[in-house]
């Protein structure tokens, strides 16, 4: 959500609602500049290893497609974010709108600013798509220079772009895509100049992200040059990007262009949006007068279609509307000033007004804090207790020096002892306090060694008694063992790869359709005919894997049903033969019981029950009659007489 606070007045911001507005954590604007190297090796198509995808693709083209896809995503989800594309190593030179013979060629040789750092327009998106997909269009621009490119010039060019186009952005990123791990060789002066320019970018607040690509005959080694110019973001900075480590492995060089694109895109997407702080530098109290400082992040949140801003479509180009709210009296249409507005509650028919200070005090439960109350084993934390989004916390050194060391010791202790801390948690001012479980989380890496989840602590809000509802009454029916055994083979064949669900492979179809429509409107494209739904089952593959097992299970189901039907109890509402009634009496003879007269047909039971219901005397009926009525209408007949009467009344009220 981009700059949502501009639609809210100061009084709305001060008098925050009790529920935390999680959408507000996405409001920081982001500026991303792609720096893509254009060299002979980067322009060489990589051989395809898949016979189904014979088309070859060069790393430069794959990187341009990454920039295009990211631009597509951000123009819809974050319309105020800026994205630019800088090509370096090109034969031509261009800086802003200057031609090859102007100052740009002299200042930044072999640097071609293809897309200026700005909010992408529809035409810029189309131009980038043409460069990435049209061979004729790319021939004029993607020509490698025979001379070496100074990385100091590239970094200084990026510095000028960020300074002039995004001077006040809190999040500024430079994405470098290259396969050259040592651009300057033994030239110490060029290496030193590049290091100085990288330090200038870091001091400016620009984060450099490297996306290395290995060559077929050479593995990319960041230690040769790039380790000296890339600075790790400080964890104490709440506006820093998510703490994802630099890729330990470079993008593969042996795969085809599509797999290379997928690898780059997934790597870029994982670092494309900074995870904003949910709360910053609040105290974590481990005991009396023993505090450290932590910041919290919201790493998981369900995405849903939402309005980022209002768009005016009446002009030649769509424009983002700046909202202004004015309060007007209903009867006189007079503009109401802020000091004239009062809030009141109804008590006994009268409105009792409260001052703003009194309203604030009503919602004030204390200063923001995370206070440890005690510790419990992880086994005492049930799975169903996780009812809200957990908060990821990480230490901060701003308020208390040494917080990282204490936090690390607590994290390791909770992991080793398999315990969770019970905490009193107030996330921010005016927020409702909650009891939460603070659980230590381990670091998780993917197959290529890239960090998926950082080590830290998770605060899981625990439900109060009012949040836990009673499960509806159901009757448990356990299937026979042969059916369970047959189904076990089916389930084993339908398991996902590595028995884990990857949400990135199954995007929300309704959300993607919503974005696709917005994208078509923004880029002046034809509206798509039908949505792409990757959540639909692959019926052919399912039939291929489990078809025989399903048929075998169906045969077993018929056999088990026949057995159950043959040995099942006889209903008292079905007319039976004299032989069945005689055998039932003989079976029951050793166990005498009080015989109760019941009706033998459904209509009879209906008449017997409905008449007392209309008179309000259902409780005078006997338990067997009530049970027979409930069984005849497919309702549960378990429980005491009071419960049976309530079920009968509920059924008859619906009729």
UniProtKB/Swiss-Prot annotation:
The record's section on SMART domains has: Ku78, SAP
Location of region: Disordered: 1-26, 568-589
Q: In the UniProt record, which is one GO cellular component term? A: chromosome, telomeric region
The annotated regions of Acidic residues compositional bias extend over 12-22
Tell me which residues make up the Ku domain: 284-493
- The superkingdom listed in its UniProt entry is Eukaryota
Q: Where in the cell is it found?
A: Nucleus; Chromosome, Telomere
Q: Under the GO molecular function aspect, what terms does this record hold? A: ATP binding; ATP hydrolysis activity; damaged DNA binding; DNA helicase activity; double-stranded DNA binding; telomeric DNA binding
**Catalyses which reaction(s):** ATP + H2O = ADP + phosphate + H(+)
Q: Recorded E.C. number(s)? A: 3.6.4.12
* SAP domain ranges (all copies): 618-652
Record GO biological process: DNA recombination; double-strand break repair via nonhomologous end joining; telomere maintenance
Task: Please state the protein's primary subcellular location.
Answer: nucleus
Asked if the keyword ATP-binding belongs to this entry, the reply reads yes
Keyword Plastid (UniProt): no
Q: Where is the composition biased (Basic and acidic residues)?
A: 1-11
Assigned keywords, A-Z: ATP-binding, Chromosome, DNA damage, DNA recombination, DNA repair, DNA-binding, Helicase, Hydrolase, Nucleotide-binding, Nucleus, Telomere
NCBIfam families in UniProt: ku70 (TIGR00578)
Q: How does it assemble?
A: Heterodimer of Ku70 and Ku80.
Q: Function, please? A: Single-stranded DNA-dependent ATP-dependent helicase. Involved in non-homologous end joining (NHEJ) DNA double strand break repair. DNA-binding is sequence-independent but has a high affinity to nicks in double-stranded DNA and to the ends of duplex DNA. Binds to naturally occurring chromosomal ends, and therefore provides chromosomal end protection. Required also for telomere recombination to repair telomeric ends in the absence of telomerase. ku70, of the ku70/ku80 heterodimer, binds to the stem loop of tlc1, the RNA component of telomerase. Involved in telomere maintenance.
Name the family the entry cites: Belongs to the ku70 family.
Protein name per the record = ATP-dependent DNA helicase II subunit 1
Query: Which lineage is the organism of this entry classified under, starting from the top rank?
Result: Eukaryota, Fungi, Dikarya, Ascomycota, Pezizomycotina
């Amino acid at each position: 959500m981009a700059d949502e606070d501009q639609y809210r007045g100061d009084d709305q911001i001060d008098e925050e609602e009790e529920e935390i507005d999680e959408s507000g954590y996405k409001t920081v604007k982001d500026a991303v500049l792609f720096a893509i190297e254009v060299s002979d090796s980067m322009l060489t198509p990589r051989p395809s290893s898949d016979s189904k995808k014979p088309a070859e693709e060069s790393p430069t083209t794959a990187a341009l497609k990454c920039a295009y896809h990211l631009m597509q995503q951000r123009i819809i989800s974050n319309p105020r974010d800026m994205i630019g594309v800088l090509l370096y190593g090109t034969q031509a030179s261009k800086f802003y709108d200057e031609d090859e013979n102007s100052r740009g060629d002299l200042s930044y040789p072999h640097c071609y600013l293809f897309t200026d750092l700005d909010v992408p327009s529809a035409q810029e998106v189309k131009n980038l798509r043409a460069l990435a997909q049209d061979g004729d269009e790319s021939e004029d621009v993607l020509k490698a220079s025979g001379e070496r490119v100074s990385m100091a010039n590239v970094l200084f060019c990026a510095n000028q772009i960020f300074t002039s186009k995004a001077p006040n952005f809190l999040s500024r990123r430079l994405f470098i895509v290259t396969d050259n791990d040592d651009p300057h060789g033994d030239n110490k002066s060029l290496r030193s100049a590049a290091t100085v320019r990288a330090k200038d970018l870091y001091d400016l607040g620009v984060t450099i992200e490297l996306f290395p690509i290995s060559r077929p005959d050479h593995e990319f080694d960041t230690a040769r040059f790039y380790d000296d110019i890339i600075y790790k973001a400080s964890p104490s900075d709440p506006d820093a990007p998510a703490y994802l480590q630099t890729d330990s492995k470079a993008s593969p060089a042996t795969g085809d262009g599509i797999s290379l694109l997928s690898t780059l895109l997934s790597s870029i997407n994982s670092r494309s949006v900074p995870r904003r702080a949910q709360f910053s530098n609040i105290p974590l109290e481990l005991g009396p007068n023993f505090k450290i400082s932590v910041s919290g992040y919201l790493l998981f949140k369900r995405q849903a279609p939402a309005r980022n801003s209002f768009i005016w479509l009446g002009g030649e180009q769509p424009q983002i509307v700046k909202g202004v709210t004015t309060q007007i009296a209903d009867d006189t249409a007079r503009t109401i000033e802020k000091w004239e507005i009062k809030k009141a509650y109804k008590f006994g028919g009268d409105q009792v007004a409260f001052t703003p200070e009194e309203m604030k005090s009503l919602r004030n439960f204390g200063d923001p804090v995370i206070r440890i109350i005690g510790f419990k084993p992880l086994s005492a934390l049930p799975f169903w207790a996780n009812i809200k989004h957990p908060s990821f916390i990480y230490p901060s050194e701003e308020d208390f020096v040494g917080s990282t060391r204490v936090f690390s010791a607590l994290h390791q202790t909770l992991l080793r002892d398999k315990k969770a801390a019970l905490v009193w948690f107030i996330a921010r001012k005016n927020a409702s306090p909650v009891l939460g479980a603070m659980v230590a989380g381990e670091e998780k890496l993917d197959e290529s060694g890239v960090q998926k989840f950082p080590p830290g602590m998770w605060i899981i809000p625990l439900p109060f008694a009012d949040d836990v509802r009673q499960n509806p009454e159901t009757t448990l029916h356990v299937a026979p063992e042969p059916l369970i055994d047959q189904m076990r083979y089916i389930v084993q064949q339908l398991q996902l790869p590595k028995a884990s669900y990857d949400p990135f492979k199954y995007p929300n179809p309704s959300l993607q359709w919503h974005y696709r429509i917005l994208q078509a409107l923004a880029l002046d494209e034809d509206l798509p005919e039908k949505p792409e739904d990757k959540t639909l089952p692959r019926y052919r593959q399912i039939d291929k894997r489990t078809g025989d097992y399903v048929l075998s299970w169906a045969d077993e189901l018929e056999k088990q049903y026949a057995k159950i039907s043959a040995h099942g109890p006889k209903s008292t509402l079905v007319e039976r033969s004299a032989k069945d009634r005689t055998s039932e009496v003989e079976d029951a003879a050793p166990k005498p019981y009080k015989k109760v007269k019941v009706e033998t047909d459904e209509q009879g039971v209906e008449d017997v029950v409905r008449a007392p219901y209309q008179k309000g005397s259902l409780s005078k009926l006997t338990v067997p009659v009530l049970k027979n009525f409930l069984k005849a209408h497919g309702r549960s007949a378990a429980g005491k007489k009071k419960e049976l009467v309530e079920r009968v009344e509920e059924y008859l009220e619906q009729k």
